[in-house]
Amino acid sequence: MRIAFYAPLKPPDHPNPSGDRRIAKLLVQALQLAGHDITLASRLRTRDASGNLLRQAKIADLGQRLAARLLGRYARSGEKPDVWLTYHLYYKAPDWIGPIMSAALGIPYVVVEASYAPKRAGGAWDLGHRAVETAVRAATTVICLNPN
């Protein structure tokens, strides 16, 4: 199966080590060992640590433009992924690409490790909070690695 993999917090090939990067790498390796063809769909990091609405809006716009570009690339190549998989989205680092891609391509949207906190509604990260809610609602499947 061809899987488009995306980690909005930190891509698996990011030069700075972190637990998030490690888990992303392990997910990719596990899927490859299972025989799947994994493509890193994007390296766009969507995290806004400061709660800056203007920055969040710019990141959202960038994600939407990147999705349009990726759709064009898939159309030109004649090949598309069988599934879109996003690892770890939360209100400070939402997925602005995956829901667009899966809807446009008619493929499943799988989320691994989604954090949705209703208390974030209306706050400094409301835009990201609403994006996570949209992504979780659009997801075909949500896989929870950490039950806490």
Locate predicted features.
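N-terminal subdomain of nucleotide-sugar transferases
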Residues: 1-45, 137
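Helix C-cap/helix->beta junction micro-motif
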Residues: 34, 101-105, 138
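Glycine-rich, highly charged phosphate/nucleotide-binding loops
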Residues: 55-75
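Short N-terminal targeting/anchoring amphipathic segment
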Residues: 72-94, 107-110, 142
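Structural alpha-helical scaffold elements that stabilize or flank donor/cofactor-binding regions
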Residues: 76-77, 101, 134-135
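A short acidic, amphipathic alpha-helical/loop segment
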Residues: 96-100, 131
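A conserved, positively charged/aromatic
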Residues: 113-140
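A short, active-site helix/loop in glycosyltransferases that binds the activated sugar's phosphate group
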Residues: 138-148
